[in-house]
UniProtKB/Swiss-Prot annotation:
InterPro entries with a match to the protein in the record: Ribosomal_uL6-like, Ribosomal_uL6-like_a/b-dom_sf, Ribosomal_uL6_a/b-dom, Ribosomal_uL6_bac-type, Ribosomal_uL6_CS
UniProt-recorded name of the protein: Large ribosomal subunit protein uL6
GO cellular component: cytosolic large ribosomal subunit
Keyword Transmembrane (UniProt): no
UniProt KW Ribonucleoprotein keyword: yes
Assembly notes: Part of the 50S ribosomal subunit.
Length: 181
């Protein structure tokens, strides 16, 4: 049995978990999340703790325990604390701003790049070269951050582009130049 799958999930008092068939709904101060869990696992909520158990003795049920436990734990964390990803813009003239909910970025193209985030994702631009993405769903926050990063991924010669905060870009040496004769 999975070590992670065996660990119980602590449920804060302001979080409510409801189970209908294979659908798990988690409600808390930061929002409401819903997810389908695999049919060969079941969620048992008791005494402020949630435990993932196998529904049968098949091997796929055992294989999904750790994943299911982590997904439910992320849902609980998301509705209580929320998740955040930070992006940095590196390059001359690279900047970001918000126009309403729309993120507008100048990334060295001939046109500004605009991105409208999903309804439950919040984007903040505290500085022109910094973007903060917040939300309750960890998967969606990561997907939005990856989408914004994909507009101009860091290039390997000068490191210009949109990168995650703290991301290290391995720079290439570039051309060695012509040998002097």
């Amino acid at each position: 049995m999975s070590r992670i799958g065996r660990m119980p999930i602590k449920i804060p008092p302001d979080v409510k978990i409801t189970i209908e068939g294979n659908t798990v709904r988690v409600e808390g101060p930061k929002g409401r999340l819903e997810r389908e869990i695999p049919a060969n696992t079941k969620l048992v909520v008791e005494n402020g703790r949630a435990v993932i158990e196998k529904a049968g003795e098949e091997k796929p049920g055992t294989a999904m325990l750790g994943l299911t436990r982590t997904l439910v734990a992320n849902m609980v964390d998301g509705v209580t604390k929320g998740f955040q990803r930070n992006l940095e813009l590196t390059g001359v003239g690279y900047r970001a701003s918000l126009q309403g909910r729309k993120l507008v970025m100048t990334l060295g193209y001939s046109h500004p790049v605009e991105y409208e985030p999903p309804a439950d994702i919040e984007i903040e631009v505290p500085a022109v070269t910094r973007i903060i993405i917040r939300g309750a769903d960890k998967e969606k926050v990561g997907r939005v951050a990856a989408k914004i990063r994909s507009f101009r991924s860091p290039e390997p010669y000068k490191g210009k582009g949109v990168r995650y905060e703290g991301e290290k870009i391995r720079l290439k040496a570039g051309k060695a130049g012509l040998k002097k004769r």
